[in-house]
Amino acid sequence: MIALPKLSQLDQASSMRVWLATQPADMRCSFDRLAELAASVTGDDPLSGHLFLFRGRGGDRLKILYWDADGYALWYKRLEEGTFKLPKIEEGARSVQLRPSELAMMLDGIDLKSVKRSKRYRRKKD
């Protein structure tokens, strides 16, 4: 079975980004069309190794596209009940960047709009 990288691997890969397209995508789209969408809505390179998330119109389906060294990989999940809860999205935004932990929470059914973060030290990048 092929699976996404483990969350612990994602957390250690500080250069990996997780992008969520804010508008629903046609779930019939596959590798090439999703790669085009990833580039147009995020402005990021689909070959970068970052994760690009696309949800279906009903909110119960999610596709994650990423480049895996020698080709695209696509992960697809359909919920039997409920919907994926999205984070707060600014009006007009075409995509939003998530932390790997937020992706894990979203996949576990946690409503990202109601999550409260405690203040933590973050080293500023040069």
Predicted regions and their residues:
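Polybasic/polar functional segments that serve as interface/processing modules
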Residues: M1-D126
